[in-house]
UniProtKB/Swiss-Prot annotation:
The gene is lacZ. This is Beta-galactosidase. It catalyses: Hydrolysis of terminal non-reducing beta-D-galactose residues in beta-D-galactosides. SUPFAM superfamilies: (Trans)glycosidases, beta-Galactosidase/glucuronidase domain, Galactose mutarotase-like, Galactose-binding domain-like. GO terms for molecular function: beta-galactosidase activity; carbohydrate binding. It holds the Pfam family LacZ_4. PROSITE patterns: GLYCOSYL_HYDROL_F2_1, GLYCOSYL_HYDROL_F2_2. Keywords: Glycosidase, Hydrolase. InterPro entries: B-gal_small/dom_5, Bact_Beta-galactosidase, Beta-gal/glucu_dom_sf, Gal_mutarotase_sf_dom, Galactose-bd-like_sf, GH-type_carb-bd, Glyco_hydro_2, Glyco_hydro_2_AS.
Amino acid sequence: MNMTEKIQTYLNDPKIVSVNTVDAHSDHKYFESLEEFSEGEMKLRQSLNGKWKIHYAQNTNQVLKDFYKTEFDETDLNFINVPGHLELQGFGSPQYVNTQYPWDGKEFLRPPQVPQESNAVASYVKHFTLNDALKDKKVFISFQGVATSIFVWVNGNFVGYSEDSFTPSEFEISDYLVEGDNKLAVAVYRYSTASWLEDQDFWRLYGIFRDVYLYAIPKVHVQDLFVKGDYDYQTKAGQLDIDLKTVGDYEDKKIKYVLSDYEGIVTEGDASVNGDGELSVSLENLKIKPWSAESPKLYDLILHVLDDDQVVEVVPVKVGFRRFEIKDKLMLLNGKRIVFKGVNRHEFNARTGRCITEEDMLWDIKVMKQHNINAVRTSHYPNQTRWYELCDEYGLYVIDEANLETHGTWQKLGLCEPSWNIPASEPEWLPACLDRANNMFQRDKNHASVIIWSCGNESYAGKDIADMADYFRSVDNTRPVHYEGVAWCREFDYITDIESRMYAKPADIEEYLTTGKLVDLSSVSDKHFASGNLTNKPQKPYISCEYMHTMGNSGGGLQLYTDLEKYPEYQGGFIWDFIDQAIYKTLPNGSEFLSYGGDWHDRPSDYEFCGNGIVFADRTLTPKLQTVKHLYSNIKIAVDEKSVTIKNDNLFEDLSAYTFLARVYEDGRKVSESEYHFDVKPGEEATFPVNFVVEASNSEQIYEVACVLREATEWAPKGHEIVRGQYVVEKISTETPVKAPLNVVEGDFNIGIQGQNFSILLSRAQNTLVSAKYNGVEFIEKGPKLSFTRAYTDNDRGAGYPFEMAGWKVAGNYSKVTDTQIQIEDDSVKVTYVHELPGLSDVEVKVTYQVDYKGRIFVTANYDGKAGLPNFPEFGLEFAIGSQFTNLSYYGYGAEESYRDKLPGAYLGRYETSVEKTFAPYLMPQESGNHYGTREFTVSDDNHNGLKFTALNKAFEFSALRNSTEQIENARHQYELQESDATWIKVLAAQMGVGGDDTWGAPVHDEFLLSSADSYQLSFMIEPLN
């Protein structure tokens, strides 16, 4: 075959997954001497990262066929940074699709056919001179991550071919190197048969996106290493099994091993390599401390390869001793039932895509630890090696997932239709499946943090995936196997050791936990579960490998899931997902915005569905983390006026690392704080007396106990708050108008009330409050109007609420005042507007304004309830005040936005913020900034002029934003929210929850909805600050 024929053969044959690649192996480092090891830099590794030359072809017809030859003229080639995605450096355009394949509707294809019209080819060239340390040795090249398929040439010689975008592709190139300048040429094809296996829900970005480096090996080299640190939780002894394979001149060589930590050597010894270059050592009864996410204790294993007692290679490995097993249908870590407080995580950076840095990883892992997240699923591909090292070090449990997803071959528009799904049980796809399983296992097997192997994601089920599971079990008896897809094809239920589901509702999960009922989703939409077989009790431990679809303003009802921890077989879940996948794009005016699918004219696209993170794409925190942090905490605190009850859900650690701060607040103002140290053993609960320092008062009192770090850790400073508990002795204002003589002007069109430094106008024509002027400053820009609806959230749209509740939007915007009731007395003015709602017969809403001699405005809105109508999102008033009033303080539940189904983690207190900061910049603008249970709030300018709003008789909900509901609703991106000439205030009797079960049909749970059959009353007071 000529080169063109060879390329087409490799691209189009699913059985060919690699040519001339090095066998997958462990990711360990190695050094030629102890001195080099102590310095920490591998001299036998030479980075090729940096500027490369490139030619980009839109399809295979435009490719540079001879670019790899040494005599090729490279003058006209462009430049590109490696690692980095093509599309983010001007070569091609990003495309976001979820389930559908990127060519859907453009080319009609079925597996294993490969797109032709859009199969872009990037031809890379890099020149290098071999470092002296690598000369006269076997030399290899390693591509840590390339999407999708890669051909490699050195000095015009074809080296090899490889697939699997997310694990290393390595080739030996020793025979092709020359003295001086060497030419490396790499052709990266966007599509091959491998593309059918990489249909993950992410931006389709291609190119060389992870490190590229050369490496050489010593004359005898530990090529592969499997280290297993077992912990016997009954004897509390460790066992270390070392299995390694050497290559080169290994005859008569010894391996010296030293296991140690900062306290000294645990064990040491040596053993000889056998005739096949292999060695196996088992070291028992080791006095060690176990590894867990709570206490990620690591030991240093140093292997010395000895040649006549001379060190010729040093191999360091971090070892964590732990035993993860399924016993009596429970997953146990070191003998204790584990609960995953997990999150799914894509590798993502808003500027560089999946080409992320160690800085990104450190930020991610610290944020996870700071918010009580203890587990991560590498959705849906193996991550960079450094991530696993950090998880070992910082303490995170990892479900390591193979690079396999074929969602678009069997699920269409939410319906299961597997007529042409792959890999199924097709022999031609088995080599690729096993290759991907092997690549992941071999590289990641030595990481203590990896406790479960996952066969992939959303690829239905069949014998090919069953063979992957069998492979994992055959090579590793220390980790169970996970695969969710069997829920769609129960014939292959044996693939997974864990009952794993996606987006199962709390009631469905509870049904499994109490009856053992299995579901088979194959004949129904993925929104609902079909009936299954009763087994009376669960046969496997349960996790939700994906749940709480946190798209936009979401995360409501998380407590309904964490409440299931009372069932032993419920072992947690993994929120979808960690970070918004949004890419910075430049507007014509030079400013940047975070783009989503479709913004690059990418078609087909799944648009804003890429914004599901609990952190924003720019790595700032979303308000959703407030709830996650509280509910994921292993420390639970319940408070009353005299004591605190603390439950320690840690598996292994007591509370000696924490300080507890007991505080008392009166009307939200701290009046006392005392420090305590409580001793609660892991898994236990205890109640302690607390001497809350409090004086007799008519104020509302808050009794609070906060748990904070006693000392700084790697992931948080001293004093970092873990969680807190509160007990509130509620006292809401019952203020009433003060009766005193008023100056009232009863005009034909307006009722005017005037007093010292104030004037109020209530309009007969506009049927609302039109002016509130204090100290000569006008506050009302747009008078209050009824509000029954909000700027719909992603979850609202997914559940069909804009359609279902459309009548309420009309009702709020176009209500008609049918009666204006005016009561004027010498010391009192009260005006009531009676609203009739369009399309809703016999429904009235009364809004009353009463003004007293101090200029205070008492506002009441009443909705009496009407059976048979759709629910509404909210009930209250929306109006606008001057744009200069941007400073916001409130006494309510914060510090982030709060909703009735997102209250855990929102604590009652006084908070200072601004109108700008209280609006969360979700990828698509939507409802945001609500504060539940508010007693009062103020909005002011920089001169302390402003208004104070006080709840009467019952706390209200409110928001103060830069834009109106309508403006937010109409915007598709944050930059489309133009600078407003007003500050928009909403004061609400109630707002429904935001939901979070999923974003494609799940309603807000009934207990968090607002029934139109119920009555609602809003009552509050407006007064000037000065």
